[in-house]
C-alpha cells in the first residue's frame, strides 16, 4: 500500500531527505516497507509550504500503527498527516518557530558586522534541550530560520527573546508560529 506523509514543515530537500532516511531505515529494519521519494511545495514567493515523503508499506498487520508510533517517536510537526485514498490521520507533536531575519531594511554596517550563522547557532544553543528539526530559507527580503521543538511555541519564543532583542541583525525580525 502506498501512503504519503505530508509534513507540516518548511524543510529544505536535504533536511527532508535526512528524515526520509530515518523512516526508510526503520521500515527496512522492521520489514514494513520503504520510502520511495518525496517532494516539496513552494509558495509563489519561493518559501517552502510543506513537504511530502512517499512510503510503500507492506500489507502486514499493524504496519500503519507501527509507522505512526515511530513517527511520533522521531518527532514531526503538528498538522502533518499520513494518508492515501482510503486512510487519513493527522499526526505530529512538534511546534514550529519561524524566525524571519530582515535582509534589506537595516543599516549597511549591521549586515557587514553581523552573521546569520551566529543567529542560527545561538538560537539552536538556547533551544538545544527541546530542539528536534531545523531548516532555513533565503528569500529576497529576509532569511527564515525554522526551529521545530518538543514543547511550547510561546515558551520557546520567550527563551530566545533576550538574544533577539540584543543582536543587531535581529532588529526588525519577525517570529511566527509555523506548526
Predicted regions and their residues:
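Short, hydrophobic beta-strand segments
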Residues: 3-9, 47-54, 95-105, 143-147
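Short amphipathic alpha-helices in soluble, non-transmembrane regions
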Residues: 19-23, 63-74, 119, 157-165
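Surface-exposed, low-hydrophobicity interaction/linker segments
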Residues: 11-36, 101-130
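A common structural junction motif
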Residues: 27, 31, 71-79, 163-171
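Surface-exposed beta-loop interaction hotspot
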Residues: 69-120
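Structured core of small recognition/catalytic domains
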Residues: 131-179
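A generic structural motif
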Residues: 34-41, 80-86, 171-179
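Short, intrinsically disordered low-complexity segments
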Residues: 31-65, 134-155
